[in-house]
């Protein structure tokens, strides 16, 4: 869970983020090797069956968020801050630009699904960039060369443009690789507006919202919602180079924000 060279650097510029090449820290490369080898269709179906009954815990959003102090994301080359520090950074950047409170809340909670790691799942099954499974992998997925060892290579249908899906079927019908995005979406889908839910569900899906891949699987509503994901992304990504947040000072505001949208406890 640690890296010998610090990844967090105050004052980083936008061009300094998301560098995935030979200079990428070994822990990040090793993460994607595992992720791309093991994110199969079979695995994704099993994870949805395991987690989406939401029968693993019942607790408040705030208490869950404080649990994430224990996590530093091995897939992220840009920060070695705790997860709660990153969540606070993101929410504060959104707030500073005057966006609605639901937008701020999306920033505050967008990574809470990473609690799956604290509950026993390996990081390769929790964090990192996401992508559709059950169809051909885009070469624009970071470290796409690692897919060569994925067992789904041997399933011809999965190696076609649409795979097990149909043209313009809509992303609701597409399995995106399992991780914290998909899990948290199902936890909070009854409490937040569709735009916030799209930010949560697809913020790690860089092949779609950054690279413009898989548009042939999207419907008109997906294209509308993806614009909100793109609005959210700079806050998630570029706030990592800013000053560390004062968690104690921000706590009253953030607790009030959570209480505005969520009951005292929800199912996880």
Regions found by a protein language model. Name each.
Residues 1-60, 70, 268:
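Non-catalytic interface/linker regions that flank or bridge core catalytic/transmembrane domains
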Residues 23-54, 119-135, 143-147, 167-168, ...:
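Charged, low-complexity, helix/coiled-coil-prone segments
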Residues 30-34, 50-51, 64-71, 93, ...:
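Residues that form generic nucleotide/phosphate-binding pockets
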Residues 44, 58-65, 193, 222-225, ...:
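Alpha-helix initiation and N-capping motif
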Residues 49-85, 166-171:
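Active-site flanking loop/helix segments enriched in acidic
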Residues 71-75, 207, 236-239, 264-268:
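Short secondary-structure junctions and interdomain/linker hinges
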Residues 79-249:
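Divalent metal-dependent catalytic cores for phosphoryl transfer on phosphate-bearing substrates
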Residues 252-268:
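Charged phosphate-binding loop/patch that engages nucleotide di/tri-phosphates or the phosphate backbone
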């Amino acid at each position: 869970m640690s890296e010998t060279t610090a990844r967090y650097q105050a004052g980083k510029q936008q061009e300094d983020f998301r560098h995935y090449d030979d200079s990428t820290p070994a822990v990040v490369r090793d993460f994607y090797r595992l992720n791309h080898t093991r994110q199969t269709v079979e695995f994704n179906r099993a994870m949805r069956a395991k987690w989406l009954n939401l029968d693993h815990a019942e607790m408040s959003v705030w208490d869950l968020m404080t649990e994430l102090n224990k996590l530093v994301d091995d897939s992220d080359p840009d920060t070695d801050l705790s997860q709660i520090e990153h969540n606070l950074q993101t929410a504060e950047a959104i707030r500073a630009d005057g966006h609605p409170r639901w937008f701020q809340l999306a920033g505050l909670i967008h990574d809470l699904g990473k609690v799956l790691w604290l509950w026993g799942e390996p990081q390769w099954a929790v964090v990192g960039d996401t992508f559709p499974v059950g169809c051909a992998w885009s070469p624009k997925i970071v470290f796409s060369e690692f897919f060569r060892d994925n067992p789904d290579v041997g399933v011809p249908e999965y190696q076609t443009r649409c795979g097990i899906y149909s043209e313009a079927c809509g992303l609701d019908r597409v399995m995106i690789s399992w991780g914290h995005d998909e899990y948290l979406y199902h936890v909070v889908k009854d409490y937040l507006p569709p735009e916030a839910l799209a930010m949560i569900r697809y913020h790690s899906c860089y092949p779609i919202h950054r690279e413009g891949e898989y548009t042939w699987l999207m419907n008109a509503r997906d294209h509308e919602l993806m614009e909100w994901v793109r609005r959210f992304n700079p806050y998630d990504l570029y706030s990592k180079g800013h000053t560390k947040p004062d968690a104690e000072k921000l706590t009253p505001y953030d607790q009030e924000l959570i209480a505005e949208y969520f009951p005292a406890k929800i199912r996880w």
